[in-house]
Amino acid sequence: MSKYNFVFALITFLGMSFVPVDKKFPNLNLKTLEGKSVELNKSFAKNKLTVVSYWATWCSPCKKELDAVKNLYDGWKKDGIEVIAVTIDNAQQLNKVKPLANQKKWSYIVLSDVNSESLRLLNFQTIPQTFVVNNMGEIVYSHSGYTPGDEFELDKKLKSLLGK
């Protein structure tokens, strides 16, 4: 293996997140952009499936992923699938989130985790990080990173989980 291939493989491996599927999603209390507290596990119980996408305003692939998901969201919502976008922006960056979400016309729920509690409890280091959680609060799918077209893989996985 050439030196460059080895370095690429090492960087890819180190950038991966090791979040086991079938693990219970931690009981997190996050905030809406208006400052209201939301208990995620209660949100999961209201939907057949919930897509939880972790992102930040400074992360270009994150914004591309959320834009791509926006185009599929109406169909998902009809099938009982909710999308929750959780920003990990720190307190200084948080004032950029709401204007960005409004500008991009993201109609799904946007929450903030300024203390990065999710990263610690779910053991991931890279964003975007996407989880699919069932109504029992179990992680049934996890994906790290974004390449154009990943949203179609996610759509296919959601349909499979719904038995479609």
What are the residue ranges of the model-derived segments?
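A short beta-strand-turn-helix
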Residues: 29-49
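Structural microenvironment flanking redox-active thiols in thiol-disulfide oxidoreductases
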Residues: 63-104, 115-120
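Short pre-active-site segment immediately N-terminal to redox-active cysteine/selenocysteine motifs
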Residues: 47-50, 54-58, 126
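Thiol-/selenol-based redox modules, centered on thioredoxin-like
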Residues: 132-164
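Conserved hydrophobic packing residues within short motifs/helices of P-loop NTPase cores
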Residues: 50-52, 84-86, 131
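Short, internal strand/loop/helix patches
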Residues: 100-136
